[in-house]
Amino acid sequence: MQSRIALVDRATPAEQIRILAYIFEIDQTGGLLLRHLVEAARRGVPVRLLIDGIGPEPHYPFEDELIVALHEVAPGIELRIFHPRSDLVEISHRMHDKLFLVGDTAVIGSTSIWDASFRNWLSERDLMVSGDAGEEASSLHAMYQHFALFWNSPEVVRPEPEKFLKVASPYRDSQGYATLDPARIHYWREWLLAPLDAEAHATDPAAADTPPASDPLDDPAAAPAPGASFDPAWMPIACERLHYVHDWPDKRSPGTLQDMLQAFDTAQHEIVIINPYLILVPELREALERKQREGVHVILVSASLASITQEFPAVGRAYADDLPGLVNAGIEVREYSDRDNRMMHAKLVLIDGHRYYLGSFNFDSLSARLNTENGLWIDIPKDGLDPLQDSVAYFLRNSSSVSDANGRLLADPDARCRAAGCGGAWRWVTMLIRRFL
């Protein structure tokens, strides 16, 4: 978060701030960033914020009183919501993209704007990219085009806070609210305009780039020391070696799934996939098993069964059900764990030791079929500086294989599920809802 806030604070009126967010919670993390965005907008920086309309739970991202207060104190912030639902029944089509653009710099990766990503609960990976957004061949230009495509799509709606005080709010109907609370609007207005205490938030864990690891020297993404200056270590990479990918708002083909399959086809020696959710759709599983048969070493690093099950037992059950088949196909499956008991949430792919993907794509049916995703492919030249090799090494080092040297599972998946909490009825429930996992 420190890097994002520094970019926002340095932004000038000649630049733009554009944010795609799957989750933007008004907790300590999101609240801190929002107040910095308000300051930027009040000094003339144009800010556009597009948030998925559902989030991790069935609710809209900002309460109406906050939207009204934002409109009053910082009209330069434009807020739109992706695909909100009035009945909250159909919630399968989600904007899972994560993109943070300020001028000629972007932050891309797995991280959402909430405490879970910045307070030592999830292990994330992001990358900062700088270039010429005005150059059509640049990845920065492609990122801005992606944002504009979503911002102007039919799947997006614009709240109209100037009307909220006169009519019932369409964003609160499902919660049974008919009018807004003037006292609540006043609270949010005062909160948004309260002075930011630089010293206070410099030592706040939410202000750090990533959760502090138990061993900062071990984790390449460990947070800098409190109060450290923002000075990224840039690694020059030729424009043609960066390829930005994303889905269309309506999730049409070809999209990120097809891009991933094409990348796997090029693998000659090794594919490493680091992803919290390994519930492979048939196309992905077939591609990986085929590459394994062709002599390509396929390594899958997952979040632990216990952490997946804690989030949603059906997901843990589906993963456990797939383990025997993956291991029998010769694929090396590993599970991440660290001393802080964080859930791995990073999304990385490494092909043949030099071609990386970093982004939002999960290896499950939601990312493959339903959710919109984005990411950056990076082709590292021979003997070139590599910004992600330490991250891949970290996740491999902090994971253990689920099978022995002879390719046999070390523990029975059913027994592991019973211990983790995804046994019993979850076997049958998972069979019914698997295509939505």
Please annotate each region the language model reported.
Residues 18, 148-151, 272, 393:
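Structural signal for well-ordered, non-membrane alpha-helices
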Residues 18, 48-50, 80, 272, ...:
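A structural signal for isolated positions on well-ordered beta-strands in alpha/beta enzyme cores
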Residues 139, 280, 384:
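Short phosphate-engaging motifs
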Residues 19, 153-160, 273, 401-405:
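Intrinsically disordered or highly flexible coil/loop and linker segments, enriched in small
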Residues 335-437:
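Long, C-terminal catalytic modules of enzymes
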Residues 1-15, 23-266, 306-354, 361, ...:
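HKD-type phospholipase D/PLD-like phosphodiesterase module
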